[in-house]
Amino acid sequence: MAAILLLLLGFSWSLAVESALAPKESESSASAMLGAGTGAAATVSLSGDYSSLLSNVPAASPVPANPSQPSGPANQCSWSYNGTSSVHCALRLIERQPGLDLQGADGSSQLTIQCSELYLFESTLPVAVFARLQTLEALRLDSCKLLQLPNNAFEGLATLKSLRLSTHNSEWGPTRTLELFPDSLGGLKQLTDLDLGDNNLRQLPSGFLCPVGNLQVLNLTRNRIRTAEQMGFADMNCGAGSGSAGSELQVLDASHNELRSISESWGISRLRRLQHLNLAYNNLSELSGEALAGLASLRIVNLSNNHLETLPEGLFAGSKELREIHLQQNELYELPKGLFHRLEQLLVVDLSGNQLTSNHVDNTTFAGLIRLIVLNLAHNALTRIDYRTFKELYFLQILNLRNNSIGHIEDNAFLPLYNLHTLNLAENRLHTLDDKLFNGLYVLSKLTLNNNLISVVEPAVFKNCSDLKELDLSSNQLNEVPRALQDLAMLRTLDLGENQIRTFDNQSFKNLHQLTGLRLIDNQIGNITVGMFQDLPRLSVLNLAKNRIQSIERGSFDKNFELEAIRLDRNFLADINGVFATLVSLLWLNLSENHLVWFDYAFIPSNLKWLDIHGNYIEALGNYYKLQEEIRVKTLDASHNRITEIGPMSIPNTIELLFINNNLIGNVQPNAFVDKANLARVDLYANQLSKLQLQQLRVAPVVAPKPLPEFYLGGNPFECDCTMDWLQRINNLTTRQHPRVMDMANIECVMPHARGAAVRPLSGLRPQDFLCRYESHCFALCHCCDFDACDCEMTCPSNCTCYHDQIWSTNVVDCGGQQTTELPRRVPMDSSVVYLDGNNFPVLKNHAFIGRKNLRALYVNGSQVAAIQNRTFASLASLQLLHLADNKLRTLHGYEFEQLSALRELYLQNNQLTTIENATLAPLAALELIRIDGNRLVTLPIWQMHATHFGTRLKSISLGRNQWSCRCQFLQALTSYVADNALIVQDAQDIYCMAASSGTGSAALEDSSSNSGSLEKRELDFNATGAACTDYYSGGSMLQHGIPESYIPLLAAALALLFLLVVIAMVFAFRESLRIWLFAHYGVRVFGPRCEESEKLYDAVLLHSAKDSEFVCQHLAAQLETGRPPLRVCLQHRDLAHDATHYQLLEATRVSRRVVILLTRNFLQTEWARCELRRSVHDALRGRPQKLVIIEEPEVAFEAESDIELLPYLKTSAVHRIRRSDRHFWEKLRYALPVDYPTFRGNNYTLELDHHNHERVKQPASPGLLYRQAPPPAYCGPADAVGIGAVPQVVPVNASVPAEQNYSTATTATPSPRPQRRGEQPGSGSGGNHHLHAQYYQHHGMRPPSEHIYSSIDSDYSTLDNEQHMLMMPGAPGGLAMEAAQRAQTWRPKREQLHLQQAQAGTLGSKASQAAHQQQQQQQQQQQQQPNPTAVSGQQQGPHVQAYLV
């Protein structure tokens, strides 16, 4: 029975996946089927434990779970014994002096020394400290912070076989490492087990293992060894007689280190008998093919949890005895051919958690592994399974293919696996289960197919799997119960949850007579009728949660005699009458979150132990037949319903856990829990309980030491009147017949008294806060209640409310807020608190409160009180609190507070007090708090009153917001008092003095009330007490006495200078914004450049990406070229060739006054990546960074600053950086660009043919200009159709140049006109030349390059000369031919050179042509008068060419 109850504690279904790597994982159970049934499939258990290797090695005694902290000297042991041979020593640390006293371990064979983990101090191990322990066989040192293990540290332990040393130095610090020496293990010839784990080791010294020739187990886990060579196997040169170190080693654990690679030289081949190698949890990313060479005895290798991407061929070739290979959790994406070749003894291969694909797992991967039992390929990237993949794995029993992307499995793929009993194909992409998929799996007992895309299950798919016991088809796309299940007569658990099954009939589970667990959660099942489960006689767990079930027919489960647990939660059930009453075996029933309205205990079977009906609409826990002995429910969850009342019959007597929270319970019947002897917990929080009596929570007597039942009552609107005072004391009751309230801090009370907060936490209430209202009350011993003048009769005054506590020790009379002018009559004589605030009492008459000897608190604040008569508070001997604040009191004469010897708190703030006589406070011997702030007091010797009347009893005083005098004598005394009583004075920051302002004199202080407008407030410095009095506090003005009039001009000059400095600082700080504003609004460029080169072809050249051409043409260029004033802008992808060379780009920048870069992500990825553009920009800006303007996108700032070539420009202050997102973008851009207001000049080019007379120059073209083509026409949109057909002009060598070539053929919307020569036919021109040029380049196989657009400019830059010299540079095209042509060239006039340059270069477009012709003709006219013959010999170079060549 206990086992069954454990099965019923879970809600969700989970089929346990059996894994050979975790053999201790439990079989699927009934809790997994809610459940599931019990699995009985026999599995092969492969042990990963190597205790057989250590069977002859005694182990050190374990450390106690909670060892006592050692006390006393550091080296003094706190001994504990486990038997006669095992000893445990606990101490703080090991010190060299005095030596470690091990007398308590004499004769023992096992010793554990554990240092305190709380002391991070270095321990020192003396040499031969264990020499006296001749019989010791096992030694363990734990948590001792050793930094060195000296030579011969264990001398004398000749019989020691096991040594475990764990310093945990990494907890001390990353640099605290344990240093070993070659002879640290000297004398331990019998040592077989050495554990050096968790020591923060960096390396093992050479020859460290030489003294321990019989060592079999070496543990180096959790250290910081980074290279395999640092483990000391490579250079183990032991002397003669020492034997071969490591020859007997069988187990090596180097996991959890920092190894990155393993080469063939790490020396592990010396370990001939090594059987187990653990290198897991390192940083291995590379292995040598000879890393495991020589390990012929190796049986287990663990390389899991590393970073291996591939493995070398022949890695395991020398280890034919391998049994297990663990390669999980790496980054393997391929396996070399023959990796497992001839490993015929291999039993386990784990390749899970890698990146293997089906292209690298084929029929040769596992060939020859005929003894393989476990194969784990889970969490990889397999997409298909070939029918030959597992062709030789005849003895395979467990195959895990979980979490791949397998979408296709060939027929008969598992046919060779006739011993397979566990197959996991979960979390793949299978769509169909065909008839031949599981052929050959005759002994398959567990099949997992959840989380696929299965929608079709063919009828004969399981015909060869008749022994299947566990089947998981959850989370697929099934629409019905597969008919193929009828072949599984031995099936015990079936999971069909999370599918789309709508209905099933009486034949759906035919032949499943052994089925014990059925899971159908989260489907679309409708109603349940008789016969649906009739073929499941052994069904014990049924999960139908999260469906659409509205009704269950009576008798639907009559054939299921063994049904023990049912889940029907989250359905639409409205009635369960007669459905479950006959299920005598039912123990667990979940009906939560349905639509149940009616519930009765007659609906459930008598043996039910666990019932969940929360989240319904149940209004009462009915028990019509008053069943108590017949009900055995122990856990009942009826929360989140509509229950309004509970009583003794609502709760079974066997109940242990009761959850009825979040209901509408407003009444708990008395003794509702008395008969519940096993009650442990009741949740009643979040209900509607307002009143609760102590007897209503009474429980059955609980005998100690059994704990009291736990009740939770928070979240109820309790009205904490005088009947609820027990709630604070319930946990302190000693009768043990009441529960323990566990959430006392969460209980809140609705207070019946209107004073204070309406809702207060229970923990903050006092006993006198639990009050009940009354109108009239007469005590039992009072005999005068029938008479009018009866002092013992409690009658509440009219228009007042009165309250009392449980024992009438507190009597509150609240007459506040009535605005009455008369004190209430017949206030009860036993009143303890009286509220008279918020009324209108101009005068408090004498003897107004006579006879109220129990009055403790009186509130007369805010009642317009202007005077208090003599003996008003007479006979109030118990009064402790008196509130007179917010009234109109002006003077206290000294008799007001007589006989108030018990008064502790007096509130006089916010009145109009100007005078308080010294005797006023004398009777207040017990005063602890007084407030006189917010009045009109001028002088009050409060320090004398304090010393005379209060002494040390006064704890709080408030003096602020008065009109204290600034007279020297008074002010010194006041400031000294405040400074000396800083802990008592609560409002020192509000204390100030009032002095007469200038012109009024000291007479203003004589009547401060009438002259308040002529006073000025002055702050007081309480840190300068005792200082000499000055006229500052005497009433004079500062200007009259403090500052001489002669200093006024100097002060004015200083202020003017300060103002000027502030203005200059602001102008300097915002100088850039000011410049831009002045330029944008008035056209004034302040502090601009002294000289701006105006004789330039363009104002700016704009470098941008071709992808940004639309924005550049339609926005930037349009705004700049059409604005006022218009600018001449050269666009890179409009006015230059698309593949412009370095020289073309360089010249374009040199004839422009500014270089503008549109810095976008497209520009960085395209244009800036070109070497020609970067080189041109650098050359053009060399020494002139102010010429650069950068328009940058905000999102590319980080990428731009990451560019090492672009960063200097971005960090230079002379460069203009403008963000496109700046709201003053256009103003800043125009300010950064040069502006020349246009001057009208005459145009030398007209349409009249008579005005032009050009000579035709015939001469061979320069060889350096052969490979040039004209630029494309300058246009932005498709509307510019003129000149689109212009083609490059090419001039062959020695060809004559016609005069027509002096003019551009590339035009824009407005082409540049040229004159027509005499005899020239219209339409003739360069067409023939173009054809000739095309033939020339086609004949020579050459592509004509772009023509330089500025070669026709006759200016200071000498473009033709520059180009000639550039072409003569090494690597320039045509350099040698150019030099020869220049030597052979004779002198010609400048005009003739100009025509030659125009013929060779061509033009850019209309704008370039017009500007070029204008400059050419102007310069021609100037040069005709003074010809300047120049020898074009290559010896003279332009200034820019010389600078470039330098």
Swiss-Prot record:
Domain (TIR) ranges: 1096-1233
Places the protein is found: Cell membrane
Domain LRRCT: 716-773
Bias kind Low complexity: ranges: 1414-1426
Comp. bias intervals (Polar residues): 1395-1413, 1427-1439
Residue spans, topological domain Cytoplasmic: 1071-1446
Pfam family of the protein (one): TIR_2
Extracellular side: 17-1049
LRR repeat ranges per the UniProt record: 133-156, 158-180, 188-211, 213-235, 246-270, 271-294, 295-318, 320-342, 344-368, 369-392, 393-416, 417-440, 442-464, 465-488, 489-511, 513-535, 536-559, 561-582, 584-605, 606-629, 631-652, 653-675, 677-699, 828-851, 852-875, 876-899, 900-923, 925-947, 951-979
Protein name listed in UniProt: Toll-like receptor 7
One GO cellular component term: plasma membrane
PROSITE patterns: LRR, TIR
Entry keyword set: Cell membrane, Developmental protein, Disulfide bond, Immunity, Innate immunity, Leucine-rich repeat, Membrane, NAD, Receptor, Repeat, Signal, Transmembrane, Transmembrane helix
Family the entry assigns: Belongs to the Toll-like receptor family.
InterPro entries, per database record: Cys-rich_flank_reg_C, Leu-rich_rpt, Leu-rich_rpt_typical-subtyp, LRR_dom_sf, SLRP, TIR_dom, Toll_tir_struct_dom_sf
Residue ranges of the TM segments: 1050-1070
Functional summary from the UniProt entry: Toll-related receptor which binds to the neurotrophins NT1 and spz5. Essential for antiviral autophagy, it detects and binds to the vesicular stomatitis virus (vsv) following infection. This role is likely to be independent of the canonical Toll, immune deficiency, and JAK-STAT signaling pathways. Functions in olfactory circuit assembly by promoting synaptic partner matching between olfactory receptor neurons (ORN) axons and projection neurons (PN) dendrites partners in the antennal lobe.
Induction comment: Up-regulated during vesicular stomatitis virus (VSV) infection.
Disulfide bonds: C722-C772, C796-C802, C800-C815, C966-C993
One example of a Gene Ontology biological process annotation: positive regulation of antimicrobial peptide production
